Structures are given as structure tokens and as C-alpha cells.
Amino acid sequence: MPSNKKRVLVAMSGGVDSSVALVKVLEMGYEAIGITLKLWENIDKKTNKVIDSDCNSLDAVNGAKLVCDRLGVHHYTLDFIDLFKTKVVNNFSNEYFSGRTPNPCIRCNSLVKWDALINQLDVFDADMIATGHYARIKKDGEKFQLHKGLDTIKDQSYMMWQIEQKFLEKTLLPLGELSKKEVRQIALDYKLINANRDESMDLCFVVDNDYKQFLAEFVPEKVANISNGEIVDEEGKKVGKHSGFTNYTIGQ
């Protein structure tokens, strides 16, 4: 138990993991505030309406708020769409058109989520942030080490490797010692609305995980300039044809 009751900003996605992270923060004796980062909106070009995706869909935001209400915690939704576009989505597009396959989740964690949450500490007069990632942070002298979560199947430490020391110092990872099964059970014990919610492994800003369609809508002029061509091996031998180099990744 903390000697003084500190305030923690808990990142709330609307899923079961972040909800149980909030539960654990409260059980540890901290005061908590739930924070949902609004990161993206996909707009249907025909209807001009927002298409739900995993990046803070209406259901997800409402789910986060309902969990906070149930646990007696204030909840806020903050708009970081511009930052997410600049740091993550633009890079995602540029990498594909440079012949590389990006990993947007790593950039999102280090350049958007942690940066945004840490910068909100002063706004909310808070001391720490907490997330529902399956990883652990250990202090070694003056350094903070990032370790795998005990649930090796769910371990997310790889997605956090770029997070800076100054951010790790102010981060709690309440699920690092828990298994997914244990997290589900805690959610059921607390009768949380999302206890049985399915997990999503898709990129949160790409509808139906169709990155080709996403690029076609996000940068249509670039996609229009990509032509078909031949696939050759390292010795220059033709081994097939391709429908545009952005549709393939190394080793495919």
C-alpha cells in the first residue's frame, strides 16, 4: 500500500485488460482516474459517417465509462487524433511505400500513448500512469528494466521496447504478474460489463484489418502510381509477378 495516497491515470481502452488494471490500481490503494485516448476516426467516403474501428469505437468508449462508473472513478476521453496521425498513421503509410512493413503499435506506445498520458499528469495533478499491458517493470539501481509478463502467451513487452526510462519510472503495469485467465476471473468477480468481451488482434485504425484498402483511401494518389511488376530473386531470376510492391512483405 502506498504511504501517501497517490493519484494514477489509468489508460482505458474499453477492454477487459485495462478495466482490470483499474481494479488492481484501486486495490493497491491508489486514487484513480480513467483516461481514454481518442486516436482515430475512419470516415466512409460515400456517407461521410464515422466507421467504427478498434481505435476507441463508441462501444469501447462507453464501455470504459461504464466500468469507471461502476468502480466510482471519474472518466475522461481526450482527443489525440492529430498526434496519432502525425506519429503513427503517416509513418505507417510511408513505410509501406518505402518497401518496408511497419509496426505501428510500437510507435503508438512510445510516441503517442505514453507521451500523451505522461503529459496529462500535471493536468490532473497525478503521480503515475497505469496500463493493461502484460509486461513488468523492475528497478535496477537508477535504471528501470522492462521485463516480460508472467503470462508468456500474452506478453507485450516487445510492443513497449521503445518507451523511455523517464516514462517507465512513472508507469504501473498491474497485469504483469497475472495470466489472462486470472484477469478474466477478476472482471467476472467485479461484474464488469466487458468481462467476456472478445479480444481484437487487428490494427486499431484499419477497418477489417485490410491495410491495402486503408492505403487506397488514405493516400489514393500514391496507390494510383503503383504499378504491377516482376518478382525476382537475389540473382535476378524472375520467379513471378506482383500487383504492386506495397502488397507484399519481405519473405513473402
Locations of regions flagged by a protein language model:
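ATP-dependent adenylation/nucleotidyltransferase module used to activate substrates
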Residues: M1-W161, L172, K181-V183, L188
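AMP-forming adenylation/ATP pyrophosphatase catalytic core
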Residues: A130-K138, E142-Q252
